[in-house]
Amino acid sequence: MEDFVRQCFNPMIVELAEKAMKEYGEDLKIETNKFAAICTHLEVCFMYSDFHFINEQGESIIVEPEDPNALLKHRFEIIEGRDRTMAWTVVNSICNTTGAEKPKFLPDLYDYKENRFIEIGVTRREVHIYYLEKANKIKSEKTHIHIFSFTGEEMATKADYTLDEESRARIKTRLFTIRQEMASRGLWDSFVSPKEAKKQLKKDLKSQGQCAGSLTKAFRRTSPALRILEPMWMDLNRTATLRASFLKCPKK
């Protein structure tokens, strides 16, 4: 999976994902599914923001990268991908400037046109289930939620999808491509199935000659940000069960 991630995603996204995992003591050599999940989420956030600007009249416009008018104000402020200290600094600055209510949890983006923070979700499960989980966690009507799935489904607060249809289609196509590329390499099942993920992890540990028990710390210390990403490939109860199964090394 790690090799796939490095081949599939932009080096900048990979670097940001590595820093995020390092910040919370995660080992990307072991938590490879999480590595892929973080990269996917980062890419969707960047694609959400791409090409969207605000003109002098305050209208949202789409500008291609080569357009000379690219000096226009970006419609979205990207918060995801920054270290926590810098991310909160950006959020506080936005709140002070715009008067927006400070969110309890770090959001992914800020929309200067609609004057609201946005939480982006990517899931392979039912979009409405993941949406409800996000809404229950955030508990704020001020933060807009937009969920995408690998099957092309999406769900957003009050059915307000923020972006034009073409921009959202680009994101859906990219997610579908990632799924197809994973499947062609035999990685998709382990990405979405706890059972397959467990098999793959045992195989990886065996090939590295490591004892799974020595990795207990890595499994227990999961950042709040990464917990948000976990439902992309397994629910939290199954995650806990999977981690518990690695607390002991098998007798030789």
Curated annotation (Swiss-Prot):
The keyword Ligase does not apply. Belongs to the influenza viruses PA-X family. The probable endonuclease active site in the N-terminus and the basic amino acid cluster in the C-terminus are important for the shutoff activity. The C-terminus acts as a nuclear localization signal. The C-terminus is recruited to host protein complexes involved in nuclear Pol II RNA processing. Signal peptide: none annotated. It comes from the Viruses. Keywords: Decay of host mRNAs by virus, Eukaryotic host gene expression shutoff by virus, Host cytoplasm, Host gene expression shutoff by virus, Host mRNA suppression by virus, Host nucleus, Host-virus interaction. The gene is PA. Disulfide bonds: none annotated. The record marks K202, K203, K206 as: Important for efficient shutoff activity. One of its GO terms (molecular function) is RNA binding. It comes from Influenza A virus (strain A/New Zealand:South Canterbury/35/2000 H1N1). The record marks K195, K198, K199 as: Important for efficient shutoff activity and nuclear localization. The keyword Ubl conjugation does not apply. It is found in: Host cytoplasm; Host nucleus. The lineage of its organism: Viruses, Riboviria, Orthornavirae, Negarnaviricota, Polyploviricotina. The active site is at E80, D108. Plays a major role in the shutoff of the host protein expression by cleaving mRNAs probably via an endonuclease activity. This host shutoff allows the virus to escape from the host antiviral response. Hijacks host RNA splicing machinery to selectively target host RNAs containing introns for destruction. This may explain the preferential degradation of RNAs that have undergone co- or post-transcriptional processing. This is Protein PA-X. One of its GO terms (biological process) is viral translational frameshifting.
